[in-house]
């Protein structure tokens, strides 16, 4: 089964995205802060990581950099989903190792299409 780690501090957004992914047959592990997210990604060995940038404990930039420099997770694609859409934030995310960027608020159908591309569905 395809597995995604969703690192998002908004329970509402996480719930909506989790439900949409699960309808597609994708297992979702949700983490609500950066520390939990890093631990979940290492433990679960997901096919994809969906990552917010504005998180408690560790920022999404820090999480991405940690995951992309860890032998257990460096190959896992990281898709940023954030309201921080300015050029500097996008550049920082890319420098941290992010593979793709989806701006919030996002269109769920369009976002699911992009996510499916990374999952090769």
Feature annotation, model-predicted:
Residues 8:
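Conserved acidic carboxylate
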Residues 44-50, 55:
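Active-site beta3 strand of CheY-like receiver
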Residues 11-29, 118:
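Two-component/phosphorelay signaling modules centered on CheY-like receiver
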Residues 14, 56, 74, 86:
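The feature encodes the CheY-like receiver
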Residues 18, 106-116:
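C-terminal output helix
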């Amino acid at each position: 089964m395809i597995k995604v780690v969703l690192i998002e501090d908004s329970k509402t957004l996480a719930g909506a995205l989790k439900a949409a992914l699960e309808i597609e047959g994708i297992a979702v592990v949700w983490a609500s802060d950066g520390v939990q997210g890093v631990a979940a990604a290492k433990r679960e060995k997901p096919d994809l990581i969906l990552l917010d940038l504005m998180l408690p404990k560790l920022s999404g930039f820090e999480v991405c950099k940690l995951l992309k420099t860890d032998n257990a997770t460096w190959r896992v694609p990281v898709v940023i989903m954030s309201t921080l859409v300015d050029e500097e934030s996008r550049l920082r995310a890319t420098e941290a190792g992010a593979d793709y960027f989806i701006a919030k608020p996002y269109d769920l159908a369009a976002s699911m299409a992009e996510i499916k591309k990374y999952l090769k569905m």
